[in-house]
């Protein structure tokens, strides 16, 4: 993943630098002309930037103002003042929205700040500038090769802006910012090569940070396209179950997870025991979630079937097991399987400290009374 992005960057840097896009008109007999000369001749970045600021302050409407801003962007970049470089870039793009090279310089300045908001803004603006530049016709004063190089640069720059958003999303520490950067990348290019590379590592990072809400957002983006990641299926299905939302989707994702883990080959390098444990976890939870949905819908036969299927996989997980046993007791009572209803209810009561125990005990007492079953 990283190498592809760096490859784009290397290509961009390898292109021959074009002559400055903006022209300068100097009349050395005027104060402004002399100041322009000083700007052009000054090699110290900080001093060049200061001279450019002076010119902008004194001659804001001069015909060479774009050239001054162009010099200012590069001077501030060289002087390691990214905020000032972005400010100058903003002013220059207001004059020339198709200046892709200046936009690129401002984007690099934004990346230097590691500020996800700044990177998002400048990735979009640079993308816009690159698209304009890629469509720009050859001007009368351009050589054919120069024009082709600029168009090629613009196309590569467009791809680089996608990489910039992708890299920023990976690096962002705030889950909301990760999602915002991903969504910006989706908006700019829904088929970007970097989207597919970004989803899983960002999902994993959000999960590790305990950011369930944003994990669900990322997972749903992936599941809308393909459903072959058991972690994402589980996170979204469990979230919907907990929030009591979209029961049909919970059932669909649970079924998909069960089917996926039943047929998915063991990854290379994973021990057999570890893989069986993982499969059991996902298949057990999948059946359990299905049973919970069917129980809330009073669909007792499918609830009974789902929970019975879950039992072999959830032994030792008292939290899941207690719920499964409670609802198995209820379902079998409704299905007139009285002895099974008693058996499952007794097993639920026997699990100490579980939240279903009191309800199971009441049900057990009522069933025995109704059917005159002696304890």
Q: Which stretches of residues belong to each language-model region?
A:
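Terminal, low-structured helical/coil segments at or just beyond the last alpha-helical repeat
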Residues: 22-27, 160-163, 267-270, 280-286, ...
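Structural register within alpha-helical repeat arrays
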Residues: 35-38, 72, 106, 165-168, ...
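Short solvent-exposed coil/turn linkers within tandem alpha-helical repeat scaffolds
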Residues: 58-65, 94-102, 132-141, 156, ...
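TPR/TPR-like (Sel1-like) alpha-helical repeat modules
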Residues: 94, 111-135, 241, 252-262, ...
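N-terminal leader/linker segments that initiate helical-solenoid repeat arrays
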Residues: 17-71, 78, 101, 121, ...
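TPR-repeat structural position
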Residues: 45, 82, 116, 175-178, ...
């Amino acid at each position: 993943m990283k190498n592809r992005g760096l490859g784009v960057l290397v290509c961009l840097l390898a292109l021959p630098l074009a002559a400055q896009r903006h022209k300068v008109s100097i009349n050395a007999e005027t104060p402004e002309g002399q100041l322009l000369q000083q700007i052009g001749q000054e090699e110290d970045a900080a001093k060049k930037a200061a001279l450019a600021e002076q010119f902008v302050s004194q001659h804001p409407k001069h015909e060479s103002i774009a050239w001054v801003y162009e010099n200012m962007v590069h001077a501030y970049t060289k002087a390691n003042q990214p905020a000032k470089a972005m400010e100058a870039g903003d002013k220059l793009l207001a004059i020339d929205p198709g200046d892709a090279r200046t936009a690129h310089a401002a984007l690099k300045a934004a990346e230097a700040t590691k500020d996800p908001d700044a990177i998002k803004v400048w990735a979009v603006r640079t993308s816009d500038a690159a698209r304009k530049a890629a469509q720009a016709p050859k001007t009368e004063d351009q050589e054919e090769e120069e024009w082709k190089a600029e168009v090629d640069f613009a196309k590569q720059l467009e791809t680089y802006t996608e990489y910039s958003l992708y890299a920023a999303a990976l690096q962002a520490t705030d889950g909301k910012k990760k999602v915002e950067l991903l969504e910006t990348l989706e908006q700019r290019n829904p088929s970007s090569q970097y989207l597919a590379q970004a989803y899983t590592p960002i999902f994993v990072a959000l999960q590790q940070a305990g950011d369930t809400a944003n994990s669900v957002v990322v997972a749903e983006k992936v599941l809308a396209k393909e459903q072959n990641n058991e972690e994402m299926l589980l996170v979204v299905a469990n979230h919907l179950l907990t929030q009591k939302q979209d029961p049909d989707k919970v059932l669909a994702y649970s079924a998909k997870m069960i089917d996926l883990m039943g047929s998915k080959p063991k990854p290379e390098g994973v021990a057999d025991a570890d893989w069986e444990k993982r499969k059991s976890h996902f298949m057990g939870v999948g059946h359990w979630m299905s049973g919970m949905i069917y129980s809330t819908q009073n669909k007792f036969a499918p609830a009974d079937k789902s929970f019975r299927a879950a039992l072999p996989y959830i032994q030792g997980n008292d939290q899941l097991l207690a719920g499964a046993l409670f609802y198995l007791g209820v379902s079998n009572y409704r299905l007139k399987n009285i002895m099974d209803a008693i058996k499952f209810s007794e097993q639920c009561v026997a699990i100490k400290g579980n939240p279903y125990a009191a309800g199971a005990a009441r049900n057990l007492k009522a069933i025995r009374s109704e059917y005159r079953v002696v304890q």
